[in-house]
Structure formats: C-alpha cells, structure tokens
Curated annotation (Swiss-Prot):
Residues 305-318 have a biased composition (Low complexity). Associates with the cytoplasmic CCR4-NOT deadenylase and RNA exosome complexes to trigger ARE-containing mRNA deadenylation and decay processes. Interacts with CNOT1. Interacts (via N-terminus) with CNOT6. Interacts with CNOT7; this interaction is inhibited in response to phorbol 12-myristate 13-acetate (PMA) treatment in a p38 MAPK-dependent manner. Interacts with DCP1A. Interacts (via N-terminus) with DCP2. Interacts (via N-terminus) with EXOSC2. Interacts with XRN1. Interacts (via phosphorylated form) with YWHAB; this interaction occurs in a protein kinase AKT1-dependent manner. InterPro entries: Tis11B_N, ZFP36-like, Znf_CCCH, Znf_CCCH_sf. The gene is Zfp36l1. SMART domains: ZnF_C3H1 (SM00356). This is mRNA decay activator protein ZFP36L1. Keywords: Cytoplasm, Developmental protein, DNA-binding, Metal-binding, mRNA processing, mRNA transport, Nucleus, Phosphoprotein, Repeat, Ribonucleoprotein, RNA-binding, Transport, Ubl conjugation, Zinc, Zinc-finger. The lineage of its organism: Eukaryota, Metazoa, Chordata, Craniata, Vertebrata. PROSITE patterns: ZF_C3H1. It is found in: Nucleus; Cytoplasm; Cytoplasmic granule; Cytoplasm, P-body. Zinc-finger RNA-binding protein that destabilizes several cytoplasmic AU-rich element (ARE)-containing mRNA transcripts by promoting their poly(A) tail removal or deadenylation, and hence provide a mechanism for attenuating protein synthesis. Acts as a 3'-untranslated region (UTR) ARE mRNA-binding adapter protein to communicate signaling events to the mRNA decay machinery. Functions by recruiting the CCR4-NOT deadenylase complex and components of the cytoplasmic RNA decay machinery to the bound ARE-containing mRNAs, and hence promotes ARE-mediated mRNA deadenylation and decay processes. One of its GO terms (cellular component) is nucleus. It comes from Rattus norvegicus (Rat). Residues 185-338 are annotated as: Necessary for mRNA decay activation. Its main location: nucleus. Residues 1-111 are annotated as: Necessary and sufficient for the association with mRNA decay enzymes and mRNA decay activation.
Length: 338
C-alpha cells in the first residue's frame, strides 16, 4: 500500500516536471540538450513519458517547491522581492535608483510675468497669508515689482465699461475706466517726458565773442534752430577778448596792416578804413566778384539765344526786361554791343 502511494506520487511529480521541461525546451532550444537527457526515476519502461532536462532554472525550482509543499500540506513559498521585480517587465533595474531623485510636484514651477506685481488681498486685510513665502502676490510695498506695460496701455477708453457700466476685467483692464486712471497715466508720462534740451555751441570764424555767444544762446532755445549768429564787424572781431595777444602771436595783424595787404589785390583806395570795404554788402561792390569778359563767340551765341527766345514769345505779350534786375555781366555785355 505504501509502495503504491509512493510510486503514484513520483509519477505525478515526474509528469509535472516533464511538462515544465517541455516549455523550457521550446523557449531555449540548444544543440547539446539531448546529451543531457536522462530517464526519469520510477517511470514505467514502456510508458513513453517525455524526458526531463537535467539543468533547472529558478522558475523550475519554484514549481518543484510548490508541488512538494502542496503534497506535504505546507503553504507555497512566494518569490523573493528581487525575483518578482525582475519578472515584472514594467520595472527596470535602474528604476530603484531613479525613485528618490524624482521631483516633487510643484517644486519646479515657473513664476509668471505678473509675479509679485499686485498686493496680496488677504495679507492687506488680515495681516497674514496662509501661503506665506510661496504666495504669488506681494506682501507689502517692499515686495511689489513694476510691470512692463504696452506703450498704448491706458491710452483709450474702455468701450465695455463706458457702454454698460461694467467691465469683467476690473482693475486689470488695459483701457481707461475713469478720470483717475487717466490722471495717473498723464502724470507718469510728464515725468518721463522732461528731458534736458540739446545744447549747441557756435563759433563765428573760429573766434567767438561775448556778443556772438549771447546771440547764439538766444537763438538756440529750440534745438532745431539752425539760424547763424549775426555777422559782426571786423572791429568787433579784432577787439574780441578771445583773440590772441598781438605781442605773443606773430600772425596777429592790425587794421592798417590788413589794408596794406589787401589794397593792391582789390584795388582799394589809399585812404579810409579797410574794414568798411571788407565788410560791405555785395550789392555795393558788384565788380569785386565779376567774371572775366566772355570771348566773341560767346557773345554771338548769346545774341542767337535772345533772338530765338523773342521769336518764341511772338504770339503772346513779350516780357519786358528790367535793367536793374540784370546781372552786372549782362549789363557790361550790352554796353560793349552798343
């Protein structure tokens, strides 16, 4: 009786082991596996039961232990934590090292552009805020930050507010709701608009005098003024305190020396002050800048031009030429023709 029970138990055990070995052979086939096959102990000779593999893996050991424990009535041993961890495909080996380094939620949040740009209402009303240092609003004037606004911020009236009397954006609206916002914006612009005026300096002929400096400062009230200072006489220039002293400067000349230098080239008379001639208007000395007389061929061309222009205006009233408005060169040419 005892022998029958033992043989039946061995038979069941060998059958389970053979089934497990079949699965292992299908998953990991090897060329030398047939050499390691052996007959199961206690199996019938002609039964034709499949053979088992002698090399066992941890999974087959687990099945054997589970079978033996079921026969003895003991609870089946569970897989160790390491074995179960590797049997789970969703868990990687490096996952255990990555778990402690995971970021806590909310630790790496990025502050918005409106961070600390408004006062915290609970802190202003109650003097305390449940968020503490993590609050996105300013706890006092010292934490309040300035917000960069658009250039057209608060420059136009809010249509919604002035149409229905209510704006859903409230104080955050970018348009004007009342006169106080307009006044506050205008005050801020006035402070930014005050800038120092651009100052220029003029030096007339390289020698600025006191009168020229006073005239230049009076004319430069507006930075766009480019009106030059009034022309001064030579006596003012020669008597300017900024001119170098004649005793120390070898290139300083008196009015008489200037007259002696320019008289031969300009045909100045012997008497009179040379400064009166040097600073006369051009209308009083027209021959000073006259060009040399033109040759005879240019005269003929000029006469042909006058004849053609007079014939072109034959159909209409011929214009009358005013001799006083003609240039000196043409008046001389007309005299030479006569």
């Amino acid at each position: 009786m005892t022998t029958t029970l033992v043989s039946a138990t061995i038979f069941d055990l060998s059958e389970v082991l053979c089934k497990g070995n079949k699965m292992l052979n299908y998953s990991t086939p090897s060329a030398g596996g047939c050499l390691l096959d052996r007959k199961a102990v206690g199996t019938p000779a002609g039964g034709g039961f499949p053979r088992r593999h002698s090399v066992t893996l941890p999974s087959s050991k687990f099945h054997q232990n589970q079978l033996l424990s079921s026969l003895k009535g003991e609870p089946a041993p569970t897989l160790s934590s390491r074995d179960s961890r590797f049997r789970d495909r969703s868990f990687s080996e490096g996952g255990e090292r990555l778990l402690p380094t995971q970021k806590q939620p909310g630790s790496g949040q990025v502050n918005s552009s409106r961070y600390k740009t408004e006062l915290c209402r609970p802190f202003e009303e109650n003097g305390a805020c449940k968020y503490g240092d993590k609050c996105q609003f300013a706890h006092g004037i010292h934490e309040l930050r300035s917000l960069t606004r658009h250039p057209k911020y608060k420059t136009e009236l809010c249509r919604t507010f002035h149409t229905i009397g209510f704006c859903p954006y409230g104080p955050r609206c970018h348009f004007i709701h009342n006169a106080e916002e307009r006044r506050a914006l205008a005050g801020g612009r006035d402070l930014s608009a005050d800038r120092p005026r651009l100052q220029h300096s003029f030096s007339f002929a390289g020698f600025p005098s006191a009168a020229a400096t006073a005239a230049a400062t009076g004319l430069l009230d507006s930075p766009t003024s480019i009106t030059p200072p009034p022309i001064l006489s030579a006596d003012d220039l020669l008597g300017s305190p900024t001119l170098p002293d004649g005793t120390n400067n070898p290139f300083a000349f008196s009015s008489q020396e200037l007259a002696s230098l320019f008289a031969p080239s300009m045909g100045l008379p012997g008497g009179g002050s040379p400064t009166t001639f040097l600073f006369r208007p051009m209308s009083e000395s027209p021959h000073m800048f006259d060009s040399p007389p033109s040759p005879q061929d240019s005269l003929s061309d000029h006469e042909g031009y006058l004849s053609s222009s007079s014939s072109s205006h034959s159909g209409s009233d011929s214009p009358t030429l005013d001799n006083s408005r003609r240039l000196p060169i043409f008046s001389r040419l007309s005299i030479s023709d006569d």
